[in-house]
C-alpha cells in the first residue's frame, strides 16, 4: 500500500512555510497607527492574522489526515506482525480499517481530531472579537492578540497529549485574548452612545 500520509505531510510542510512567511511579514510590518481601523490599509496587520488563521486551520486539517493514515499503517503492520509471529498460527490479528482508525478516536488520532474541533469551536468568537476590536478599538492591538491566539491554538495538539492541566497552556491564553478583545470592543461601542 502506498504511503498515503505523504500528501497531507507535504501540505503540512507547505502550510508551515506559508505561516512562517506571513508571521515574518507581520513582524516587519511597521508604521501602523494605533486606534481603530479607518481604512483598508490600516487593517493590514489583521489581514495577516487572518491569512495565518487560514494556514493554521488547514495545517491542523492536513495533520488530522496524516495522523489517521500513519496510525492506520502502524496498526496494520502491528496486526500483520502479530499474525505472522503467533505460535501455532491460531491467532489471526485483524487489521483495522481506515474508518475504524480515523473515527475510533484513540491516541494520536484523538489529539489531532480534538485540535481541529477545538480550533473550529473557538473560531466564531475569535473572528468576531478580532474584527470588532480592529474596527472599534485598535487594529494593531487586534493583530497582537490575534497572533497570541494563533500561538495558543498551534500548541493545542502537543499539550492535549500531556496530562491535565497542560491543555490549559493553550486554552486559557486563547480565552483571554477573545475575552479581552471583545470586552474592549463592547466598552468602546457603549462609550460611544
What are the roles of these predicted feature ranges?
Residues 130-151:
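Short alpha-helical packing/oligomerization segments
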Residues 54-72, 152-159:
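Transmembrane alpha-helical segments that form the membrane-embedded catalytic/substrate-channel core
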Residues 29, 182-193:
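Juxtamembrane boundary at the C-terminal end of a transmembrane helix
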Residues 154-179:
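Interfacial loop-to-transmembrane junctions
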Residues 13, 117-130, 178:
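Core segments of transmembrane alpha-helices
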Residues 13-18, 171-185:
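Small-residue-rich segments of transmembrane alpha-helices in multi-pass membrane proteins
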Residues 63-114:
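Cytosolic, membrane-interface loops and tails of multi-pass inner-membrane proteins
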Residues 2-65:
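Long, highly hydrophobic alpha-helical transmembrane signal-anchor segments
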Amino acid at each position: 500500500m502506498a504511503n498515503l500520509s505523504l500528501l497531507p505531510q507535504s501540505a503540512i510542510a507547505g502550510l508551515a512555510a506559508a505561516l512562517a512567511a506571513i508571521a515574518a511579514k507581520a513582524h516587519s510590518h511597521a508604521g501602523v497607527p494605533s486606534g481603530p481601523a479607518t481604512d483598508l490599509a490600516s487593517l493590514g496587520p489583521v489581514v495577516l492574522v487572518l491569512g495565518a488563521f487560514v494556514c493554521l486551520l488547514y495545517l491542523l486539517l492536513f495533520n488530522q489526515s496524516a495522523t489517521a493514515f500513519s496510525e492506520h499503517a502502524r496498526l496494520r503492520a502491528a496486526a500483520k506482525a502479530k499474525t505472522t509471529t503467533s505460535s501455532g498460527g491460531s491467532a489471526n490479528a485483524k487489521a483495522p480499517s481506515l474508518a475504524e482508525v480515523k473515527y475510533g478516536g484513540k491516541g494520536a488520532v484523538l489529539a489531532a481530531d480534538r485540535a481541529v474541533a477545538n480550533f473550529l469551536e473557538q473560531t466564531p468568537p475569535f473572528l468576531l472579537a478580532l474584527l470588532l476590536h480592529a474596527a472599534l478599538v485598535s487594529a494593531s492591538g487586534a493583530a497582537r492578540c490575534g497572533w497570541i491566539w494563533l500561538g495558543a491554538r498551534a500548541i493545542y495538539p502537543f499539550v492535549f497529549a500531556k496530562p491535565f492541566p497542560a491543555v490549559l497552556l493553550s486554552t486559557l491564553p486563547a480565552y483571554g485574548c477573545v475575552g479581552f478583545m471583545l470586552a474592549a470592543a463592547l466598552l468602546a461601542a457603549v462609550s460611544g452612545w
